[in-house]
């Protein structure tokens, strides 16, 4: 009796088929900066447009939101979640994305599922001017069972050394601005699934205006474009413009499925801050796991505290439904979910009018005050 790799649960032919299905999607994210094709051992990327670039790297996943995608057998948006999450993470330093890599692992490789996932990755990479330069698709029988799979992403961006944003310049009196989230984004799904266990995902919820499944799969919003308008200029406004730069057009961005993302051209690999107006952004936080307190505290210097005013921003119905269903205390909700704020910026009060002019959706949600103890974040009112 002879055995093959397929007998052990690994289908090389299925893997090759998956690669064939995703080739064009991946290639569609390439610009002239990508020096290698698909299938090499490593990806070569040449970038310019910076005086003194600092590379910024991050890795992340999408958590158990995957279980919702699996339950609905819809895999075309989970890649959008992953890319946008990673872009937002490096954006907090002022970095623009350069390139992205992904890792997909499943118990039994299904080429069509891989193609749907990578299609979402490529769509978001195009919208954000980021090249999808490589990845790994692993078939791992015995590690993942049934339809389960996992997804992780790795991003590299760049920022000028003298334009790094790290929170160190945050001062008492600075204003805190919030940008609305598109919903749960990619955090808190284990609690949500526990509370909604047995609830049909295809049931229409009047308070949501759509089915529960549609609400839970709403893509993680990307904040690159609104933040780009606020950051101080890095390069002249005319530099790198035009379709030859590899950037996504406004039509492509608007039709990308990232409905909360502002339309507008994105130049791959270009330094942020091409807008003519300047706002002194002193700190930025992406509100993910840990909520507002856990993430904003990471950028507040000692002796200062971020004071948020509860009620100064809208909280989407999905969060209210979760809190009521599980009788979850507000303190726990704040620790787990973004509660309507997906991204936070800290700017001096003198820039108030410029912030409102450049990003009308930005909401003043608090201010920086002096702190007596170790607490870096406080939410008052409500």
Predicted segments, located by residue:
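Gly-rich Lys/Arg/Thr-decorated short loops/hinges at beta-loop-alpha junctions or inter-strand turns
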Residues: 2, 61-70, 204-211, 300
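Acidic-glycine-rich active-site phosphate/pyrophosphate-binding loop
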Residues: 50, 54-56, 61-63, 201-202, ...
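A generic structural signal for residues located within well-ordered alpha-helices
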Residues: 10, 14, 78, 187, ...
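N-terminal amphipathic/basic leader segments beginning at the initiator methionine
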Residues: 1-35
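Glycine-rich, acidic
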Residues: 184-230
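Glycine-rich beta-alpha junction loops
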Residues: 61, 157-159, 180-185, 193-196, ...
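Glycine-rich phosphate/pyrophosphate-binding loop regions near the starts of catalytic domains
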Residues: 21-182
């Amino acid at each position: 009796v002879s055995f093959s790799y397929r007998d052990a649960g690994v289908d090389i032919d299925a893997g090759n088929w998956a690669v064939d299905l995703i080739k064009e999607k991946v290639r569609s994210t390439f610009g002239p900066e990508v020096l290698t094709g698909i299938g090499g051992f490593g990806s070569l990327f040449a970038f310019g447009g910076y005086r003194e670039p600092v590379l910024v790297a991050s890795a992340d996943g999408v958590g158990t939101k995957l279980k919702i995608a699996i339950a609905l057998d819809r895999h075309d948006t989970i890649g959008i979640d992953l890319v946008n999450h990673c872009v937002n993470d490096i954006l907090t330093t002022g970095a623009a994305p350069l390139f992205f890599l992904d890792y997909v692992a499943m118990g039994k490789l299904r080429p069509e599922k891989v193609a749907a996932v990578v299609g979402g990755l490529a769509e978001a990479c195009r919208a954000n001017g980021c090249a999808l330069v490589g990845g790994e698709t692993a078939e791992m029988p015995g590690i993942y069972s049934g339809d389960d799979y996992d997804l992780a992403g790795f991003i590299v961006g760049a920022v000028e050394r003298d334009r790094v944003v790290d929170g160190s310049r945050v001062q008492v009196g600075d204003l805190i601005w919030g940008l609305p989230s598109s919903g749960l984004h990619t955090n808190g799904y284990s609690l949500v699934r526990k509370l909604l266990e047995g609830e049909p995902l295809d049931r229409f919820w009047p308070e949501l205006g759509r089915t529960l499944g549609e609400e839970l799969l709403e893509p993680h919003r990307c904040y690159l474009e609104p933040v780009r308008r606020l950051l101080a200029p890095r390069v002249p406004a005319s530099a790198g413009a035009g379709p030859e730069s590899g950037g996504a057009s406004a039509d492509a961005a608007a039709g990308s499925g990232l409905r909360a993302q502002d339309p507008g051209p994105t130049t791959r690999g270009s330094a942020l801050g091409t807008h003519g107006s300047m706002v002194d952004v002193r700190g930025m936080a992406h509100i993910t796991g840990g909520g507002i307190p856990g993430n904003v505290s990471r950028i507040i210097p000692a002796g200062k505290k971020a004071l948020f005013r509860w009620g100064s921003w809208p909280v989407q119905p999905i969060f209210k439904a979760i809190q009521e269903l599980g009788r979850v205390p507000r303190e726990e909700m704040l620790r787990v979910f973004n509660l309507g704020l997906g991204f936070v910026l800290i700017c001096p009060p003198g820039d108030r009018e410029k912030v409102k002019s450049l990003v009308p959706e930005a909401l003043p949600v608090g201010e920086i005050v002096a702190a007596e103890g170790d607490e870096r974040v406080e939410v008052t009112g409500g």
